Each structure stands twice: as structure tokens, then as C-alpha cells.
């Protein structure tokens, strides 16, 4: 078989290109360098990204994507009938090629049903036969940061190495959007703001303790005058409420009550962000917000946040990274991270000049 690098995608000839994006906020952020490489490879192409609705707002800030299509599953694209209808919609757009950043079998199946002539992605999940350009996934790539996971696939297909840096610029309407959200939730809109994302989608093994988040928040409020804003999904509302209860100072709890765009607008206003390993952590890093990320069960080598002012706190427990949803033992990876550890890192970041200040 001819090596795929010798028969890569003819990017420079493409005029209509589909990209199947990843499903989760953090993964989307980590695909941005790959999207930049695709854009650079196909300067003539109109690039459409197919994504789930809960990440769509993020692409308003991505200059490398022209159009966003929503994959509503659950919803109208659920089941075989829904996937057939989605494939029909894709067929009507006459895409010449599809790059699958998402690994699922169904991503390849839908693009095959859509009759897209060139279909490329990692040959995982039993889908190699459905792809015209399956990329072999070696073990070495799994040990590198996930930014490389996506970028190396595009490079193998013939794309350039455009670097791994990530920086999102807030939308022009973000200041007004953030002001509106903050005032709706009882804030004067005056900072400085400390953002805290105490939840984690994957499971409780990734979550630091509510009382320790609160302790750090209170001390930073006492010493730096920060006002804490809590972020998260509806599922994170209980842990956010627990943090607010534990604190001495009032907090603005936005968990479960904002759109992604509204959350991003407020995050972009934060002076400092404190988070578990989560999608919002990756967003804060991409905005260049000084950031402290608490890692326990997951591996900072592969999913650490971007950003020059991103600090990872981990104790490298002997059982970590276990990548489990719940801890089967004594949760030592998080127990060993103290409020003092996090406060010390936060105080150092808050003592540094803000970006753009002398």
C-alpha cells in the first residue's frame, strides 16, 4: 500500500471541505492548531465544521472556519433515520473532502452516506474501511499532548506544521455580554474577578474539594479584593452551590445558567481562573487568562492547559494518572493538594502585572 503521506489529501484544490469537530469544549480547544493547519493547507476552500450544539459558540471566535453545521444528536439526527437525514443535508452541500477530527465510527459512516469522495481520519473504532485516507494511530502519539494528536493527523495527510500555540480573542460584543450577565446575577460589574470552575464532566475523580476552593477564594478576596464567579454546566450546579456555601464572601454562581458564549464572555473578564481539568480550564488558557489547574486522576502531560500563565498543580501520586471516573481507593491525588498550595500559586499570579501593563 502506498504510504498515506504520498497520497495525501489534495488540499490546495479543494473548494468545499467538511471537518467533523470534536464533541467537548476542551477537545475543541485542543483541535484549534489542527484547524489552523487545515486552513493553511486549503486557502481556497470554504470550510464547514460539523459539531454538537453545546460547542458551536466557540467557533464564532475561530477564524479558520467559515460555516458551522449542528449535529443534533440527541435530537433530530438521532438514530438511523436522523443520521440518514443529516447525510442527505451534507450531500446537498457537495463537499469534496471530509476531515474527521472526531474518532467515532459514526463520523465515518455519515460522511460515507453523504457521498463525500475523500474521507480522512484516524483509522480507529473499526472505521478504516469507510475512509479513503485512514491514518494509522501509533502508541507514541497517545503519550503526547492531545494538541499533537490532532495536528499530527493533519500533517500526515499533507498539511503543514503551523505550530501548537492557541489564542482566542474575545468577540467585540463580549464586554457588553459579560456586563449583562454579571448585572443580571447581582454584580456591579466591577472586578477584579476570580473565576472558579469546580466541576468536571468526566466524573468526581477529577474534582478538587468544595471547601478548599472556598478557602482559596476567601483568602484571595481578603488579600487581593477579588470577586468570585462560579462557572459550570447544570450538572455542576450542586458543587458550585457547595463552594458558595463554604465561603465567607458572597459569590456569583453562574453554573447552569449561561450559554457557552455568555460563559466565555465572563471568563474573558477574569483576572485569574481556578479549575479542575475541564473544558472551561482550556478556554481560560486559550484566552490567556492566568490560570491554576488542579490535576489528580488525569494526565497533565496530555491535557494540560495552554497559555504562558497556566500553572498545573499535581502531586504525582503513585496511582496517578488512573483516568478513572471515581477513585477506587483513598483519593490521595486530590487529598494531597492543599488550599495553601493553590493559594500560593494564585497569589504569585495576581502579584504579576496584567497583560499589557508595565
Which residues does each predicted region cover?
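Catalytic machinery of carbohydrate-active enzymes
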Residues: 1-358
Amino acid at each position: 500500500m502506498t504510504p498515506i503521506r504520498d497520497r495525501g489529501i489534495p488540499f490546495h484544490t479543494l473548494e468545499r471541505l467538511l471537518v467533523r469537530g470534536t464533541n467537548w469544549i476542551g477537545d475543541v480547544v485542543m483541535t484549534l492548531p489542527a484547524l489552523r493547519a487545515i486552513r493553511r493547507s486549503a486557502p481556497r476552500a470554504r470550510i464547514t465544521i460539523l459539531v454538537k450544539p453545546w460547542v458551536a459558540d466557540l467557533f464564532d471566535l475561530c477564524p479558520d472556519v467559515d460555516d458551522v453545521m449542528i449535529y443534533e444528536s440527541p435530537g433530530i439526527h438521532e438514530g438511523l433515520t436522523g443520521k440518514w437525514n443529516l447525510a442527505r443535508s451534507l450531500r446537498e452541500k457537495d463537499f469534496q473532502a471530509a476531515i474527521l477530527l472526531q474518532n467515532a465510527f459514526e463520523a465515518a459512516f455519515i460522511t460515507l452516506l453523504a457521498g463525500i469522495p475523500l474521507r480522512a481520519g484516524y483509522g480507529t473504532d473499526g472505521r478504516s474501511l469507510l475512509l479513503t485516507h485512514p491514518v494509522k494511530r501509533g502508541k507514541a502519539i497517545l503519550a503526547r499532548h492531545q494538541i499533537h494528536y490532532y495536528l499530527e493527523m493533519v500533517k500526515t495527510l499533507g498539511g503543514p506544521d503551523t505550530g501548537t500555540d492557541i489564542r482566542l480573542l474575545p468577540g467585540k460584543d463580549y464586554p457588553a455580554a459579560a456586563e449583562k450577565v454579571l448585572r443580571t446575577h447581582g454584580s456591579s460589574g466591577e472586578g477584579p474577578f476570580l473565576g472558579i470552575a469546580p466541576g468536571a464532566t468526566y466524573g468526581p475523580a477529577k474534582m478538587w474539594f468544595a471547601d478548599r476552593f472556598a478557602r482559596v477564594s476567601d483568602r484571595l478576596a481578603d488579600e487581593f479584593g477579588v470577586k468570585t464567579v462560579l462557572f459550570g454546566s447544570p450538572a455542576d450546579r450542586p458543587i458550585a452551590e457547595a463552594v458558595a456555601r463554604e465561603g465567607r464572601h458572597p459569590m456569583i454562581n453562574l453554573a447552569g445558567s449561561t450559554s457557552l458564549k455568555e460563559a466565555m464572555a465572563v471568563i474573558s473578564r477574569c483576572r485569574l481562573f481556578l479549575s479542575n481539568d475541564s473544558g472551561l480550564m482550556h478556554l481560560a488558557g486559550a484566552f490567556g487568562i492566568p490560570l491554576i489547574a488542579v490535576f489528580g486522576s488525569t494526565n497533565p502531560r496530555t491535557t494540560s492547559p495552554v497559555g504562558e500563565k497556566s500553572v498545573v498543580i499535581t502531586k504525582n501520586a503513585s496511582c496517578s494518572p488512573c483516568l478513572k471516573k471515581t477513585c477506587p481507593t483513598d483519593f490521595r491525588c486530590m487529598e494531597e493538594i492543599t488550599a495553601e498550595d493553590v493559594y500560593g500559586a494564585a497569589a504569585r499570579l495576581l502579584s504579576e502585572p496584567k497583560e499589557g501593563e508595565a
